[in-house]
Each structure stands twice: as C-alpha cells, then as structure tokens.
Amino acid sequence: MINDELTAAFNAKPRVDINNIKKMTPGQLDQVKNYGSMAENLLKNKNFALFVHHYKFDMSDAVVGIAGHNEEDNARRLSIVHNIAGIDRFVEFLQNAVRFKNMAVNIQSPVNTKGNINE
C-alpha cells in the first residue's frame, strides 16, 4: 500500500534534464545538489559500504555453491550474476548523482575550478 511518506519520497526525486544542466533554474540546481548530497552521504557511510560488499560476497558464494551444469543451475547462476550487476548499477547511480551535484555547485559558484568567472 502506498502511504504519504512513500509518495513524498518519490516526489523528492529531481525531475530535471541533466543534459542541459547549464540551462537549469537555481531551484532545479538546488534539487540536483540536495539529491547528490544524499547520495554522497550514502556512499560515505561505512555501514552501507560494508553491507554492499557483504551482499556481493554472499552472492559470489551462492554462485560458487551451484555445482550442477544443467539448465536450471545455469539459470540460477545467471540470476545471481544479474543481482550482483544490479547492486553495481545502483552504486554507479549514486556516483552519478554526486557527479551531477558537483557540476551544479561548479555552475553556481562565481569562479569555476578552471579560474574562469561564470556568467
């Protein structure tokens, strides 16, 4: 069942075109920065990193534990490998959010990292 908290979390997702980051309004840039900060906090959390690595090790052990070579065993192996790839894609998603946050900060700063004044 969808509750108000879930709806608020879904609506908090920034709906901006990252490909046109230089044309964003200050409000949109603030959304990107807030979202990126949340992602950065997750990536810096040692407990989160520990659980991600434990999950990947657990999945790797599950793959090694499949001894058979029939179609069902191969399908289980493939499913587990997709789970491992999924967690890697999630971490990449978080890293991209941080990268976009850094781009937004650079755009809003009066002097960018190259020493040029932003107009």
Question: Residue locations for each model-derived region?
Answer:
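Intrinsic-disorder/low-complexity detector
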Residues: 1-119
